[in-house]
Amino acid sequence: MRLILGLVLAVILSSATAAAAEPKLVWEVKGLSQPESVVHDPATDVLYVSNINGAIMQKDGNGFIARLKPDGTILERQWVKGLNSPTGLALRDRTLYVADVDELVEIDAASGSISKRHKAKGAIFLNDVAVAEDGTVYASDTPMNTIWRLKDGTFEPWLANDDLNGPNGLLVQGDKLIVASFGRMPGEGQKQELAGLLAVSLEDQTIEPVGKGEPVGNLDGLEPLAPGVYLVTDWAGGALYRIDSKGKADQLINLNQGSADLTYFPETNTVLIPMMLDNTLAAYRLSEPAPQTKKKTK
């Protein structure tokens, strides 16, 4: 009898633990227009969210940046106007960098005014942006398998290689540029390939898979969770993954298609995910203990 009671108790505790392990939706804000990327500005404690607001990759002038409180309250829906199809965002000092079709746009975060536009001649779709500690800016051109670089005022292709496999999300870590690949663009009648994480040497541009390099999905957003561990969204599959240095992927959240370029708050173990096709921004509190990691300069 004691054994049976012990087994029953174990099952109950196991079920309770499993239930507690589910990430919790904290809030969800509606009223956005194809939100693609979100970053946090620690100086003003606000969120910036890029909104495509039209056809992807079209130069229609409809794109904008929204400004929100960290709880999802919209402060200014169209804080910055006059963009085309804005996607990836990165904040360095008081400059907000925006990937906008074939331009890298600089916005003064203090005033919300556009200060510079760097033309990427020959680019098709600049997708994500990341900034290194020295201020060098990297931008991915997904369909062209190219990484662009802004350094000392010059914006030019830095690495063009088909092994990038549709580079999307970017993250600078030490002497490596971590790349979340979307997969090669399919031809007519072909199925979209799945892809994984890559590590590119900033010194010699060597491309290596993260871990075994097994394909995970059509990857988009990329954030550090712990040393060698990443939070990654699958845009097409609709999921949030935890991928470690061996390339092992664990799905944390099942989402709708369109889960895009996220940001992560280690202090509260909360992840913010733009749901591009749902026109929402969703905040989830993860279940596992928040590790101590340096938040990336996105």
Label the model's feature ranges.
Residues 6-15:
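Bacterial N-terminal signal peptides
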Residues 23-26, 103-144:
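Asp-box/WD-like beta-propeller blade repeats and closely related beta-sheet repeat scaffolds
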Residues 24-29, 73-80, 113-119, 154-160, ...:
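A short beta-strand motif characteristic of beta-propeller blades
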Residues 32-44, 55, 61-62, 80-96, ...:
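Beta-rich, blade/repeat-based domains predominating
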Residues 53-57, 103, 144-145, 184-188, ...:
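Short glycine/acidic-enriched loop and turn motifs that connect beta-strands
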Residues 61-66, 103-105, 146-149, 196-198, ...:
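A short loop-to-beta-strand structural motif that recurs across blades of beta-propeller domains
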Residues 68-73, 108-113, 150-154, 201-205, ...:
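Short loop/turn segments that connect beta-strands within beta-propeller blades
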Residues 259-297:
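Blade-level signature of beta-propeller repeat domains, shared across WD40, Kelch, NHL, RCC1
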